[in-house]
């Protein structure tokens, strides 16, 4: 299979022939790359890249028709590619405002337990309405909804990976109370904090036997 990747007019295209054509918004790629760089510790200075870049790709990615899954596969292959054209393309994505905005949000929620939109806006230096618009473009969702999701995920990771209690995880992630965290779990995931604790206990026991 022969494919090509290029960036132009805020979109990324990947195609192999006239029968297959995938189109991704560059902001989705920027979000993926920002997460990868942030959590892998790969944040570096990137040089200027051309606005239109292309390269040939030999691997067949047609095994999935899910656009989000396809984007993940492409980005991972691009990140680990040694092709200079690929590196230039990623450098261009790293120059976008969406990329830096996602990094800004990730850094802020790591430093502060409770993040307010007003505070984010003031530090970013734009109006609240414009900030919300930028976030919507970069995140693909409302900024408050996305921040709440990230906070919930961080809380769950504290419980599962760091063996914290529900109470400790709630306090460490800016929840007003344990019940607030518990209600969020129930609303978003469909099971209670007590059930979550039981799941954690069960997983630990299974791992001990293994």
UniProtKB/Swiss-Prot annotation:
Occurrences of domain HTH araC/xylS-type (ranges): 99-199
Which key words are in the record? DNA-binding, Plasmid, Transcription, Transcription regulation, Transport, Virulence
Q: Does this entry carry the keyword Magnesium?
A: no
InterPro entries of this UniProt entry? HTH_AraC, HTH_AraC-typ_CS
Report if keyword S-adenosyl-L-methionine is assigned.
no
Q: Which domain of life is it from?
A: Bacteria
**Binding region for DNA:** 118-139, 166-189
What GO terms are given for molecular function? Answer: DNA-binding transcription factor activity; sequence-specific DNA binding
Identify the SMART domains for this entry. Answer: HTH_ARAC
In terms of Pfam families, this protein maps to:
HTH_18
Entry function? Necessary for the secretion of ipa invasins. Probable transcriptional regulatory protein.
Its name, as the record gives it, is: Transcriptional regulator MxiE
Organism encoding this protein: Shigella flexneri
């Amino acid at each position: 299979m022969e494919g090509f990747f290029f960036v132009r007019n805020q979109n990324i295209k990947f195609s192999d022939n006239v029968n297959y054509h995938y189109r991704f918004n560059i902001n989705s790629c920027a979000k993926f790359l920002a997460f990868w760089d942030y959590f892998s510790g790969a944040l570096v200075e990137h040089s200027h890249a051309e606005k239109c870049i292309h390269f040939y790709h030999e691997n067949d990615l047609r095994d999935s028709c899910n656009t989000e899954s396809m984007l993940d596969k492409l980005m991972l292959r691009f990140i680990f590619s040694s092709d200079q054209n690929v590196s230039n393309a990623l450098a261009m994505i790293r120059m976008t405002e969406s990329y830096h905005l996602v990094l800004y949000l990730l850094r802020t929620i790591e430093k502060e337990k409770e993040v307010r939109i007003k505070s984010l806006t003031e530090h970013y230096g734009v109006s609240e309405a414009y900030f919300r618009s930028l976030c919507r473009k970069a995140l693909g969702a409302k900024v408050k909804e996305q921040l709440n999701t990230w906070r919930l995920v961080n809380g769950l990771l504290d419980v599962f990976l760091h063996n914290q209690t529900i109470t400790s995880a709630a306090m460490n992630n800016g929840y007003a109370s344990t019940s607030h965290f518990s209600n969020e779990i129930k609303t978003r995931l469909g099971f209670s904090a007590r059930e979550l604790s039981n799941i954690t206990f069960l997983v630990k026991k299974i791992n001990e036997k293994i």
